[in-house]
Regions:
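Walker A/P-loop
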Residues: 208-238, 250-256
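Conserved alpha-helical scaffold flanking the Walker A/P-loop in AAA+ ATPase domains
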Residues: 198-199, 243-268, 279-290, 323-327
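C-terminal alpha-helical "lid" subdomain
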Residues: 343-402
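Conserved nucleotide-binding/hydrolysis micro-motifs of P-loop NTPases
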Residues: 244-246, 269-272, 298, 302-308, ...
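Pre-Walker A (pre-P-loop) alpha-helix and adjacent loop at the N terminus of AAA/AAA+ ATPase modules
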Residues: 175-208
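Conserved catalytic/switch belt of AAA+ P-loop NTPases
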Residues: 256-257, 272-319, 324
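Conserved AAA+ ATPase "SRH/arginine-finger" region at the nucleotide-binding site
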Residues: 318-330, 337-351
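AAA+ P-loop ATPase mechanoenzymes
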Residues: 1-184
């Protein structure tokens, strides 16, 4: 290809238009622009080459590797249409044409680019040369589209945990690495949540889930560990704060057509009796705004069985339908299809949790001594719980507890 062809095809991307916003690809486009400019000055060309290579080398020395990853992770209207089984012939032709060009671009070297521009490569002999290799991008991209239900596309291919900011999903780059295998105890309770999640992943009817119980019993850790465990199967977690509940219907609309499965996670949920967020959650759980998409479930944790903070003032108010109002508030938890209770561990369960954690952390202290010290630690910490057990074991590991 001649230089003007490289430049025109790069600037003429339609399906993969978003690539031009990628810092490395943008620098490559600037380099081809510089080469095509009627200017024999060497310094601006050196600047363009060096700027591109500096951007590329921050990630890899191989242009083909970088471009192939960028292409496979870019969210396009073609992959969205294909995921919905609606890819038109026009879009398919445009997709294949651009993939063919991008495949050639993966193999482009600096010397080949200079040759296409009729420039002498010896002029830039002092500059490093990036590596390049052609890949079968068409086959790889078609495979990615077929696997969109598990691997996703765009930011969903790179991340599996998200938060919400100003109504938009924001990836969490370093999510909690909690594993199910690291959560001893509460296996029966946890299995109910896992079974419901598997149903969601299978496309079967799945319940909204309320994980209720004492603080530190592993409710939040269970949800996060499940998200990590099943990320490779197409599960994504969206953490929603209580003051963002009103945004959930819009989030559901955004995610309903996505081939992945989503848990909308509300941690430490509770309401006061006059909380506007109560009505928002009620509408979501009842589906009054519309039918809930089968690829989405709401998981919430709470220390309160009925989610409502009741005060004496609430009970002595002037609501003439006080009993009905209180019952309405109390019944919110019943609108979750599945409620799983995590109670404080009794002594035997606490001991079993400690023993398993001690094995995981390679604590050598005799078990009887460990239990005595852990019980004393739990009294000072406010009572037995898996969180307290973990804190104690970590202190043993660090040498604080001897």
């Amino acid at each position: 290809m001649q230089l003007h062809e490289w430049n025109a095809r790069l600037h003429g991307l339609v399906v993969f238009r978003a690539l031009l916003g990628d810092p490395v690809v943008a620098k490559l486009a600037a380099l081809t622009d510089r080469l095509e400019a009627a200017d024999d000055t060497i310094a601006p060309l050196c600047d363009a080459v060096a700027a591109f290579e500096a951007a590329l080398f921050a990630h890899t020395t191989n242009l083909g590797d970088y471009l192939s990853n960028a292409v496979l992770e870019t969210e396009t209207f073609c992959v969205r249409q294909a995921a919905a089984g609606q890819l038109s012939p026009v879009m398919e032709a445009a997709l294949n044409s651009e993939l063919s060009f991008l495949q050639k671009l993966c193999g482009l070297t600096l010397d080949a680019l200079l040759e296409a521009a009729d420039r002498q490569s010896r002029e830039l002999a002092f500059l490093p040369r990036w590596e390049a290799r052609q890949l079968d991008l068409t086959a790889a991209y078609n495979q990615r589209m077929r696997e969109a239900g598990k691997k996703g596309y765009g930011m969903f291919a790179k991340h599996h945990v998200f938060t919400v900011e100003n109504g938009q999903l924001v990836p969490v780059k370093y999510p909690d690495p909690q594993k199910l295998s690291e959560l001893p105890g509460y296996e029966k309770e946890r299995e109910k949540v896992i079974a419901n999640t598997r149903a969601l992943l299978a496309g079967s009817p799945a319940n909204n889930v309320l994980l209720y119980g004492d603080a530190g019993t592993g409710k939040s850790s269970t949800v996060k560990a499940i998200a990590n465990e099943y990320a490779a199967d197409g599960l994504r977690l969206v953490e929603v704060k209580k003051n963002q509940l009103y945004q959930i219907p819009d989030l559901m609309d955004q995610l309903a057509a996505n081939p992945l499965k989503f848990i909308l996670f509300i941690d430490d949920l509770s309401f006061s009796s006059n909380d506007d967020n109560f009505a928002a959650l009620k509408a979501i759980l009842e589906g009054s705004v519309g039918g809930r998409a089968r690829n989405i479930a709401v998981y919430a944790t709470s220390n309160r069985r009925h989610l409502i903070k009741e005060t004496l003032t609430d009970r002595t108010g002037d609501d003439i339908h006080e009993a009905d109002t209180r019952q309405e508030l109390m019944s919110l938890s019943a609108r979750f299809g599945l409620t799983v209770t995590f109670q404080r561990p009794e002594k035997a369960r606490f001991a079993a949790i400690l023993e398993e954690l001690a094995k995981q952390h390679h604590i050598q202290m005799p078990m009887e001594e460990l239990l005595v010290k852990a019980e004393a630690f739990a009294i000072r910490a406010g009572g037995r719980s898996p969180r307290v057990a973990k804190q104690f074991i970590e202190q043993c590991e660090s040498g604080v507890q001897k």
